[in-house]
Amino acid sequence: MKTGKELKPGTVLRIDNDPWLVQKAEFTKSGRNSAIMKTKLKNLLTGYKTETVYGADDKLDDVILDRKEATLSFISGDSYTFMDTTDYTMYELNAEDIDAVLPYIEEGMEDICEAVFFEGRLVSVELPTTISRQVTYTENAARGDTSGKVMKPAKLKNGTEIQVADFIQIDEWIDIDTRDNSFKGRSKK
């Protein structure tokens, strides 16, 4: 059991026997009213999204999900097939099931993912917090007034755009924090 004030992104709740993922949680306390938690939830079985408000002391059922290591095997249209690294079982997910990690998914990636299961059914995939990707396009840095941290847009192999440091060039590998889509530095790859 969790209370409303303990909710944070990544928490999974059982509401009407369905697993709901907390995607965003914002705690608000005003002087007149009691504290509340505004949340954005996603149903892991149907993909339906909703916004809900909970009181700070509301009691909620949390769910423990099963997790297994997996790798991306192949992509076919909007279908992504992952393979369990221990028993080589294949699992398939649609693009809308993995929309949070879709910007980092690309054919031939070597990252070990976590396949997330609810009652034996694959409902989502989570990537490591840091991944390495190759920059395929970026502009040359502007010379001159560059005091502080200067960033510029860069495009990755799968088309995702990210802000990188001005010294990054085309074909370099960079490390990306998947939690907030931020540039961490050059990759040691």
Curated annotation (Swiss-Prot):
Task: Output the Gene Ontology terms for molecular function.
Answer: translation elongation factor activity
The pathway that the record names for this protein is: Protein biosynthesis; polypeptide chain elongation
Q: Which Pfam families match?
A: EFP, EFP_N, Elong-fact-P_C
Where does the protein principally reside? cytoplasm
**Superkingdom classification of source:** Bacteria
Q: Where does the record say this protein resides?
A: Cytoplasm
**Keywords (A to Z) from UniProt:** Cytoplasm, Elongation factor, Protein biosynthesis
Q: Has the keyword Protein biosynthesis been applied to this entry? A: yes
Give the UniProt record's GO annotations in the biological process aspect.
Answer: peptide biosynthetic process
Can you tell me which family this protein belongs to? Belongs to the elongation factor P family.
Query: What is this protein's record name?
Result: Elongation factor P
Q: Which organism is it from?
A: Pseudomonas entomophila (strain L48)
